[in-house]
């Protein structure tokens, strides 16, 4: 499912996409995806893309409830110590196992991404250290009581140490280091134009709905609407307010607020 986190907005989509039977979904977006590096720039389009390629220890539902991500469970052991258990059998897109050591690497990387214009370090400000208990168990020590730690970790995409240890942001953008554990794998990123994803069939026990997903950057509102009406794309975001009545009246289309 294509999800967008953040402020409420509207989507217009072709009714043909609703049963999710199509093999290829194309979405035209108002704002560009600027990087595949999930720790480089905290911006809504980048976060939306990262939801599909990477996973977080803890995820959020559409109603902002916390739900298991890479972690199947978490609990406080004391006021300044949390235990997280990773999902057995979780794998990266290259087939390698996701381990607690990848989480340690991720937490160390987040505040140290070179030239980041606005990253995610603030979400980890309470973390003092992480202990690997075994490959699927880790203990996170905090500097002070941190009851919101699971909520903060819902913002942090976990990346592979193997592929990220020597990688720069450019290596994520090229695809070399963009090896996630999410439902889709990154196929191609053309900055200012499009991002292409392909389904990862090894994700959990679930099969993602579309085989391929393309995000196109179309900043002109009229161009997005025209592309939708012509059938060139299946979904657009932020349709012009003046066009919403017309789009709602078209039986081939649906308009939704998220």
Residue ranges, per PLM feature:
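N-terminal signal peptide c-region/cleavage motif recognized by signal peptidases
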Residues: 15-19
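Ligand-binding "clamshell"
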Residues: 23, 245-258
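Short, well-ordered beta-strand elements
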Residues: 23-32, 72, 81-84, 103-107, ...
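N-terminal lobe/hinge region of extracytoplasmic solute-binding protein
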Residues: 28-78, 108, 115, 177-180
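Aromatic- and charge-enriched surface segment that lines or borders ligand/interaction sites
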Residues: 72-116, 139, 224-227
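Surface-exposed binding/hinge segments that line
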Residues: 75, 121-163
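Gly/Pro-rich hinge or "lid" segments in bacterial periplasmic/extracellular proteins
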Residues: 154-208, 212, 222, 230
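Ligand-site clamp/hinge motif
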Residues: 200-246, 258
């Amino acid at each position: 499912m294509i999800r967008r986190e953040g402020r409420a907005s509207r989507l217009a989509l072709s009714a043909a996409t609703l049963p999710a039977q199509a093999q290829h979904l194309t979405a035209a977006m108002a704002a560009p995806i600027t990087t595949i590096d999930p720790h480089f720039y905290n911006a809504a389009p980048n976060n939306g893309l990262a939801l599909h390629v990477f996973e977080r220890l803890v995820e959020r539902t559409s109603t902002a409830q916390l739900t298991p991500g890479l972690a199947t469970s978490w609990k406080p052991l004391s006021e300044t110590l949390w235990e997280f258990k990773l999902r057995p059998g979780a794998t990266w897109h290259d087939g390698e196992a996701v381990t607690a050591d990848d989480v340690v690497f991720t937490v160390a990387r987040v505040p140290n991404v070179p030239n980041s214009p606005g990253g995610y370090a603030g979400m980890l400000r309470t973390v003092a250290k992480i202990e690997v208990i075994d490959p699927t168990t880790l203990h996170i020590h905090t500097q002070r009581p941190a009851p919101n730690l699971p909520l903060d970790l819902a913002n942090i995409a976990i990346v592979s140490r193997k592929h990220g240890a020597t990688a720069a942001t450019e290596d994520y953008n090229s695809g070399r280091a963009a090896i996630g554990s999410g439902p889709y794998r990154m196929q191609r990123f053309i900055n200012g134009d499009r991002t292409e994803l392909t389904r990862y069939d090894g994700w959990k026990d679930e099969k993602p709905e579309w085989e391929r997903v393309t995000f196109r950057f179309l900043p002109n509102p009229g161009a997005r609407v025209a592309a939708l009406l012509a059938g060139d794309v299946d979904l657009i975001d932020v349709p012009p307010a003046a066009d919403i009545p017309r789009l709602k009246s078209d039986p081939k289309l649906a308009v939704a607020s998220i």
